[in-house]
Curated annotation (Swiss-Prot):
GO terms for molecular function: ATP binding; DNA binding. This is Packaging protein 1. InterPro entries: Adeno_IVa2, P-loop_NTPase. Induction: Expressed in the intermediate phase of the viral replicative cycle. ATP binds at G173, P174, T175, G176, C177, G178, K179, S180. It comes from Human adenovirus A serotype 12 (HAdV-12). One of its GO terms (biological process) is nuclear capsid assembly. Belongs to the adenoviridae packaging protein 1 family. Keywords: Activator, ATP-binding, DNA-binding, Host nucleus, Nucleotide-binding, Phosphoprotein, Transcription, Transcription regulation, Viral genome packaging, Viral release from host cell, Virion. It is found in: Virion; Host nucleus, Host nucleoplasm; Host nucleus, Host nucleolus. Residues 442-452 are annotated as: DNA-binding.
Length: 452
């Protein structure tokens, strides 16, 4: 008897997805599941828009396309701020151009082309040039704002060295130009910071100092030691109520024990142990040109005193010279002094050839027109009966303070030669733009006449 065969219906396998028959004209592809595998949720993540993948390059139906990024639109250059900047810059450029045109030394300068008026500039300048001028005026404002924290409200400088140490300065001036008064004013007006507690006044012979000058020194250095305080009080600027004034001959200065900081008899070391000191050499040009070297006081002394005596927070040396280029300098004191000096204080009454030589040496980074402008400033003040001075700072706190003007009433005023040089370069740029336009116009007319 044959065994019995089960004739019942086959049961479908559980968890088996239904099979769909592929179209005969379409290649079968594996369709992605709309469900995620819980063991690997990030595998085959697709959009839920449909089972079949869309052809390459076709955007999905009803999908939002991202718009391409557009460059930011530039605002109008002739708005109120733009016109204000251009107008302000135009006034500055016109003032500089008129000054340069009326200089006696302007014969050697090339004439610069410019627009006849502000209205002509605004109408014919063009978008590119006007935009550049507006940006340049913003830059000029930034240059002026950078130096504002270093000035008083009236625009004068708050200090000559701005706590930069040591202070080594040379004063050039002929007889009778007010060099001694200038030295006292620098200390009494608190232009040298910190204020010295001991001032050494060195001359060839102590007997040559008149009593009235000694009294003036004592009064003015005491005046420079105080500033006005609240409610009518005065505040001392140093550790002493009355700075000490010490008269010293040049021979006493060059004694052997004064060269050694560790020597207990060194008078400069004794004073440095109490506070800042200042050394003033007046009428000592002949002594400086001798064989005895004193260059140690210009470069070796400051660092040694600062290291040995912490209270000596200031070291100031001012040397008076009647000639900017003395022939007699046997020990090299004057040459070394001019190298180490950070401040060159010049009287406009010095010989013009010496001043021009100094200006040509120290203004090589400035345009020729600005150098000639500086020479014209010296010539202008040389004709005035005023005890004013022009100062060159080799290491200024700001570039605008490299050249400054010291007036008895106005104080120490910066000359802003860096801004004047920047404005002159703008004038040169306008000149080049107008030259290019004229050249293009000539070339256009030549070609036009050629084909007619």
């Amino acid at each position: 008897m044959l065994p019995c065969r089960s004739t019942g219906r086959r049961h479908a396998l559980q968890h088996q997805p239904p099979q769909f028959k592929a179209h005969t004209g379409q290649r079968s592809t594996r369709s992605a599941s709309i469900h995620r595998d819980r063991n690997n949720p990030d595998a085959h993540i697709t959009s839920l828009e449909g089972q079949n993948p869309r052809p390459f390059g076709c955007s999905p139906p009803r999908s939002l396309q991202q718009q391409p990024a557009k460059p930011p639109q530039r605002g109008s250059l002739l708005d109120r701020d733009g016109i204000e900047n251009i107008t302000e810059l135009w006034d500055r450029l016109q003032l500089l151009k008129q000054t340069l045109d009326h200089m006696p030394m302007a014969d050697g300068l090339k004439p610069l082309k410019n627009f006849k008026s502000l209205q002509e500039l605004l109408s014919l300048g063009g978008e590119r040039l006007l935009g550049e001028l507006a940006k340049q005026n913003i830059r000029v404002r930034q240059m002026m704002n950078e130096v504002a924290p270093l000035l008083h409200e009236d625009g004068s400088c708050t200090s000559l060295n701005y706590h930069l140490q040591p202070v080594i300065g040379v004063i050039y001036g002929p007889t009778g130009c007010g060099k001694s008064q200038l030295l006292r004013n620098l200390l009494s007006a608190q232009l040298v910071t910190p204020a010295p507690e001991t001032v050494f006044f060195i001359v060839p012979q102590v007997d040559m100092i008149p009593p009235s000058e000694i009294k003036s020194w004592e009064m003015q250095i005491c005046e420079g030691n105080y500033v006005p305080g609240p409610e009518g009080t005065i505040i001392p600027q140093s550790g002493t109520l009355c700075p000490k004034f010490v008269k010293l001959s040049y021979d006493d200065l060059t004694l052997d024990h004064n060269y050694d900081v560790s020597d207990p008899e060194n008078i400069f070391a004794q004073a440095a142990a109490r506070g800042p000191i200042a050394i003033i050499m007046d009428e000592c040009m002949e002594n400086l040109g001798s064989h005895k070297g004193v260059s140690k006081f210009f470069h070796a002394f400051p660092s040694k005193l600062h290291d040995k005596f912490p209270k000596c927070t200031g070291y100031t040396v001012f040397v008076v010279l009647h000639n900017m280029n003395p022939r007699r300098d046997l020990a090299g004191n004057i040459a070394n002094l001019k190298i180490q000096s950070k401040l060159h204080i010049m009287s406009p009454r010095m010989h013009p050839t010496q001043l021009n030589r100094f200006i040509n040496t120290y203004t090589k980074g400035l345009p020729l027109a600005i150098s000639l402008l500086l020479k014209d400033i010296f010539n202008h003040h040389a004709q005035r009966c005023c005890y004013d001075w022009i100062i060159y700072n080799t290491n200024p706190e700001h570039e605008a303070l490299q050249w400054s003007y010291l007036h008895p009433k106005d104080g120490l005023m910066p000359m802003y030669l860096n801004i004047q040089a920047h404005l002159y370069k703008i004038l040169e740029h306008i000149h080049r733009v107008l030259n290019d336009r004229e050249r293009w116009s000539r070339a256009y007319h030549v070609r036009k006449n050629k084909y007619q």
